[in-house]
Amino acid sequence: QMCIRDSKKGYQFSSANSINIGRLVPQIVYYVYAYAKLLANGEIKDGEKINVVVPTGNFGNILAAFYAKNMGLPINKFICASNENKVLYDFFTTGEYDRNREFVLTTSPSMDILISSNLERLIYRIAGNNAAKNAELMASLKSEGKYKITEEMKAQLADFYGNYATEAEDAATIKKIYEDCGYVIDTHTSVAATVYDKYRKETGDTTKTVIASTASPYKFTRSVMNAIDSKYDSMGDFELVDELSKISNVKVPNAIEEIRTAPVLHDTVCDSDKMCDEVKKILGI
């Protein structure tokens, strides 16, 4: 980020990850589309509320659902699903956000996050759009690695439910859904499915629910296939891709298929403290 901020050389950089509002705005459409499909299929009545379950680390996709509700979409509950990096679960449970903890490498790496960037946008809303209060909390996060919201702010999170899935639970859910339904889900969607199961058992809520499946199993083939059966452990990467296609009856995506014969274009490796120098070298500045 420090490198991105260096504009003295005439270059302007932008981030394309989920902190960019350009990612959040199209994601709002997911939930409107899902609601429209439920209506079209006769699953719900017009105006009937639904729940949404989102596997998240950076709080982007679920924030898009929150914005969709603010635009009028009938959503009852936002179910926030975390992996073992459960900083969001702890936040919704206690009202304290604390990143001072061990970072866990999991099989759902897109959720391996301890600083959930988009949560700041939700904090701003529950602080009554108070920019000064928001800045105060974010300053505490930067200096102390944590902050705590007020009871009044916490009361505004009643529509949110947080829980998490362990690595073992994640793998077990992938296996169970495949065996029960013949459907293969990825490691992130499995976190969501696991947490939804916990939510149902805790609350008994039978509201029609949409689980956001945020990734393809082809992105995490080894973790997915190993969860289904240990016999796949010894297979090579592309053998696993072919096996996944067979058991899921889903064609290998072109982007994956092309990798088999594609030349390696980028082979630069550097230490994190050398990243800025490497970017400058590539740009010739």
Kindly give the residue locations of the regions a language model identified:
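Glycine-rich phosphate/pyrophosphate-binding loop at beta-loop-alpha junctions
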Residues: 43-46, 51-140, 212-228
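Active-site-adjacent helical/loop segments in soluble small-molecule enzymes
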Residues: 8-42, 46-49, 125-203, 262-268
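Exposed alpha-helical structural elements
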Residues: 87, 121, 132-137, 169, ...
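Electropositive phosphate-/nucleotide-binding environments in soluble metabolic enzymes
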Residues: 21-29, 59, 112-116, 120, ...
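Non-catalytic terminal extensions of PLP-dependent enzymes
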Residues: 145-149, 234-285
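Short, small-residue-biased leader/transition segments that mark boundaries at the very start
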Residues: 2-4
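Catalytic phosphate/nucleotide-handling subdomain of diverse soluble enzymes
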Residues: 73-92, 194-261
